[in-house]
Swiss-Prot record:
Transmembrane segments: none annotated. SUPFAM superfamilies: Kazal-type serine protease inhibitors. GO terms for biological process: acrosome assembly; fertilization; spermatid development. The N-terminus is blocked. Phosphorylated on Tyr residues in capacitated sperm. Residues 26-276 form a propeptide. This is Acrosin-binding protein. Its main location: secreted.
Length: 543
């Protein structure tokens, strides 16, 4: 069955939202502060109107195709924030994604990770709107003050940046779908026209012949180079031509480590800030020109194949080099990689043009597992888009012995049958294998490295997102009817019980059940207890 038209989704969503306003307005006699999060009671009513999940999926489909500025989406977001969508960072009740740089980003994260009923909560401490200060090498023309006092000029610049950051990834995402003439496109000509109108409003001060440029204050040299590129473009340019332009940009990736917490999946806007504001190339894919090569090698190829030809002037082909590369990573990271047309085009290019073939291997000796038609390729690309190392694709040979599937892909699709554990009768024991390693390894690493270890936290996050069921899908309950303050404390208890030959599984949290609710301090005690027991066990075996 084909996807419903954009107008049908809009009509359906308006019907769904009809009772929303009065329901939330009756919550309390005193008027809540505009822009503040809903109370738990208000959220129960709010989510009740988005239940069952197909209703939430409908709103997500609309958000994905129209963006956060669609009037119906704006109305929905206003309901969730007492009439005013906040401008700046927000916090959530998700244990491993506790804050986001905008409410739009938070909403998109809920949709892309299928955690439809995650709640916005009050932040325990102020969070800066842009996290560029966390990058030591960042050389931004605008300094972000550590205090709350800013000059009117600085405030205006920050507001402009925030506006462009919110709109830019949405435009890129639509552009890549438009470029590839996706059969998965949900909007058609009517949506494209509406989206271009939104872009025109945001860039009303720009010359009409320069609509593809963004209000980010790029240097004059880059603007001139961009104009020269546009002059050379012809109507028959293909996806390969665009990728070749990315290769000619000669992007080089630095080797200094970056904070792992600022990953593309949880912080796309901070990532775009790095690409837009830093003169040095972003740390994304080492030696990207080796993957993409130059346009001269591809000009004569596949001209006969209409599937790879774009009939639209502009779009992604007119973006600057860095953005053209970023859109590929953004597209596969913020959507389900195995279903995106950009991933299919990228895979085709590497297999046929660059001669890598069907098998996917990297320079770490790993052979990415083809659990589905695009799984192996997406596993590699998601790792490359997030990688802090010089990760490159290689021709597969006998040296690539380690079977591997990226946890980033597992978190996206939740369909890796050989990795994901079984979920029966509302219970979930955990992932059978993560990163090629079984639960015993991860329990040991949790005991020795703690919850904050990068690899441990990635394992915990993937497992947490692998099971969302019950009346409170973001809460963590087990088969002993204990409710945990976070997933790490539950996993510590599960590892402890496993060591004692007792099986404890995660169980859906139900409204009509009674649970022993643990405090955060009790949760920390469980983590410490497992660490101590593991240390004792290790000493007794090897001491």
């Amino acid at each position: 069955m084909g996807q419903p038209a954009a107008g049908s989704i809009l009509t359906l969503l308006r019907v769904l939202l009809l009772p929303l306003g009065p329901a939330l307005a009756q919550d309390s006699p005193s008027a809540p502060t505009p822009g503040s999060p809903l109370s738990p009671t208000e959220y129960e009513r709010f989510f009740a109107l988005l239940t069952p999940t197909w209703k939430a999926e409908t709103t997500c489909r609309l958000r994905a195709t129209h963006g956060c500025r669609n009037p119906t989406i704006v109305q929905l977001d206003q309901y969730e924030n007492h009439g005013l969508v906040p401008d700046g960072a927000v916090c959530s009740d998700l244990p491993y994604a506790s804050w986001f740089e905008s409410f739009c980003q938070f909403s998109q994260y809920r949709c892309s990770n299928h955690v439809y009923y995650a709640k916005r909560v009050r932040c325990s401490q102020p969070v800066s709107i842009l996290s560029v200060n966390s990058f030591k090498e960042l050389e931004s023309p605008v300094e972000v003050s550590p205090t709350t006092m800013t000059s009117p000029v600085t405030s205006h610049i920050k507001a402009t940046e925030r506006q462009s950051f919110q709109a830019w990834p949405e435009r890129l995402s639509n552009n890549v779908e438009e470029l590839l003439q996706s059969s998965l496109s949900l909007a058609g000509q009517e949506q494209a026209a509406g989206h271009k109108q939104e872009q025109g409003q945001e860039q009303h001060k720009q010359d009409p012949t320069q609509e593809h440029k963004q209000d980010d204050g790029q240097e004059q040299e880059e603007q001139e180079e961009e104009q020269e590129e546009e002059g050379k473009q012809e109507e028959g340019q293909s996806v390969e031509d665009m990728l070749g332009r990315v290769g000619r940009a000669g992007l080089r990736i630095g080797s200094e480590p970056k904070p792992q917490s600022l990953s593309l999946s949880s912080d796309p806007h901070s990532f775009t800030a790095r690409v837009r504001d830093v003169d040095s190339a972003p740390m994304m894919i080492e030696n990207i020109q080796e993957l993409i090569q130059s346009a001269q090698e591809m000009e004569e190829m596949y001209e006969e194949d209409a599937y790879w030809r774009s009939q639209n002037h502009g779009s992604l082909l007119q973006l600057p080099h860095k953005e053209a590369l970023l859109v590929l990573c953004y597209s596969i990271v913020m959507n389900s990689c195995v279903m995106t047309p950009s991933a299919k085009a990228w895979k085709y290019l590497e297999e046929e043009t660059f001669g890598f073939g069907k098998s996917v291997c990297d320079n770490l000796g790993r052979r990415h597992m083809a659990l589905c038609p695009l799984c192996a390729f997406c596993s590699l690309k998601l790792e490359q888009c997030h990688s802090e190392a010089n990760l490159q694709r290689q021709q597969c040979d006998a040296s690539h012995k380690t079977p591997f599937i990226s946890s980033l892909l597992t978190a996206q699709t939740m369909s890796m049958g050989t990795q994901a554990g079984t979920s029966e009768s509302g219970r979930f024991y955990g992932l059978d294998v993560y990163g090629g390693l079984r639960m015993d390894f991860w329990c040991a690493r949790l005991a020795t490295k703690g919850c904050e270890d990068i690899r441990v936290s990635s394992w915990l996050q993937t497992e947490f997102l692998s099971f969302h069921n019950g009346d409170f899908p973001t809460k963590v309950c087990d088969t002993d009817y204990i409710q945990y303050p976070n997933y790490c404390s539950f996993k510590s208890q599960q590892c402890l019980m496993k060591n004692r030959n007792r099986k404890v599984s995660r169980m859906r949290c139900m409204q009509n059940e009674t649970y022993n609710v643990l405090t955060p301090s009790k949760g920390e005690d469980l983590v410490l207890r497992w660490s101590q027991e593991f240390s004792t066990l290790a000493l007794s075996r090897f001491g």
